[in-house]
């Protein structure tokens, strides 16, 4: 039975799912907002919130944990020096998911906009 199993599989195996989260997190932190499907957006929200929470700590271990996921030194530097200080007084909810009215042209999948809260 599947009771109390959290998280979505998104029809991918675990390494593919992790690569998807990492790529979308990089895009979101680089550009500030991205458009994706609703289930991917809801999963990305928790992944990015965790990275920002680690960046708020600011210590070396947190930097290494974030670098493990983002694998981009310049982006980690941007996260720690520019993005995390904006959320110094915020206790969570660093990202926002807005459902869009239009659907994807190819398959009609519902789309959402994921953005960093100001």
Swiss-Prot record:
Keywords, ordered alphabetically = Ribonucleoprotein, Ribosomal protein
What's one GO-annotated cellular component?
cytosolic large ribosomal subunit
Quaternary structure and interacting proteins, as annotated: Part of the 50S ribosomal subunit. Contacts protein L32.
* One GO MF term attached to the UniProt entry: structural constituent of ribosome
Q: Which GO biological process categories is it annotated with?
A: translation
UniProt keyword rRNA-binding, yes or no: no
Record flagged with keyword Ribonucleoprotein: yes
**InterPro entries per UniProt:** Ribosomal_bL17, Ribosomal_bL17_sf
Q: Which domain of life is it from?
A: Bacteria
- Any stretches that span the bilayer, and where are they? none
Which PANTHER family does the entry link to? LARGE RIBOSOMAL SUBUNIT PROTEIN BL17M, RIBOSOMAL PROTEIN L17
Cystine links in this protein are none
What organism is listed for this UniProt entry?
Thermus thermophilus (strain ATCC 27634 / DSM 579 / HB8)
This chain belongs to the protein called Large ribosomal subunit protein bL17
- Tell me which family the UniProt entry assigns to this protein: Belongs to the bacterial ribosomal protein bL17 family.
């Amino acid at each position: 039975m599947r009771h109390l199993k959290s998280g979505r599989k998104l029809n991918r195996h675990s390494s593919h799912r992790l690569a998807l989260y990492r790529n979308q997190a990089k895009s979101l932190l680089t550009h500030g907002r991205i458009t994706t499907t609703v289930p991917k957006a809801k999963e990305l929200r928790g992944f990015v919130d965790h990275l920002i929470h680690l960046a708020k700590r600011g210590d070396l271990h947190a930097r290494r944990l974030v670098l493990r996921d983002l694998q981009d030194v310049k982006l980690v530097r941007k996260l720690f020096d520019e993005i995390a200080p904006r959320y110094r007084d915020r206790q969570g909810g660093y990202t926002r998911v807005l459902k869009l009215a239009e659907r994807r042209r190819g398959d009609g999948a519902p789309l959402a906009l994921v953005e960093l809260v100001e």
